[in-house]
């Protein structure tokens, strides 16, 4: 399970430079959840794309329906105290803090391309590239080898 923010959802359902990567995120983990406000944020992002003449209004409506039908599996309520605390501590908007708060409450990653969230909440926020990268191998701590003289002590030299 991951928390999917609005930009991940838009990249998944629209033709963008990040669409292929968003599809790979979905293939790796298809259980996406978001706070209730994802709908308004996706609609706002699609409207922004329409106003920039990147898509017509019919395509924006279709993209929203695709996001609603195919991407977000679960929607969760947030604790307002936690949201406001995250917003205050990380310097985020309450909108962005909803996603971070949800990821922390569920103990999962928030996959986002929002640079401020990635910078201020590295405990839960991952870019698509980070999420798709293989995990770092565990660090192996090796004991310092004993000096040759110590290792040879007690052995006979016949």
Residue ranges, per PLM feature:
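Short, well-structured N-terminal submotif of metal-dependent ribonuclease cores
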Residues: 1-37, 49, 53-58, 142-158
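PIN-domain endoribonuclease scaffold, especially VapC-family toxins
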Residues: 23-90, 101-106, 119-122, 137-138
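Acidic, PIN/NYN-like endoribonuclease modules and their adjacent C-terminal/linker elements
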Residues: 1, 73, 100-158
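A generic local structural motif
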Residues: 18-20, 95-98
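Short beta-strand scaffold positions
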Residues: 4, 33-34, 94-97, 112
């Amino acid at each position: 399970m991951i928390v999917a923010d609005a930009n991940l959802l838009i990249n998944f359902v629209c033709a963008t430079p990040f669409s292929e990567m968003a599809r790979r995120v979905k293939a790796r983990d298809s259980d996406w959840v978001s706070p209730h406000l994802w709908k308004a944020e996706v609609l706002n992002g699609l409207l922004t794309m329409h106003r920039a003449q990147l898509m017509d209004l019919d395509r924006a409506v279709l993209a929203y329906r695709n996001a609603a039908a195919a991407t977000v599996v679960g929607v969760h309520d947030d604790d307002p105290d936690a949201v406001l605390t995250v917003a205050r501590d990380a310097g985020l908007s309450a909108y962005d803090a909803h996603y971070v708060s949800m990821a922390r409450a569920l103990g999962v990653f928030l996959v986002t391309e929002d640079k401020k969230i990635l910078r201020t909440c590295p405990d839960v926020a991952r870019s698509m590239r980070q999420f798709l990268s293989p995990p770092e191998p565990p660090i192996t701590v090796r004991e310092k080898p004993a000096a040759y003289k110590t290792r040879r002590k007690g052995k006979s030299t016949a």
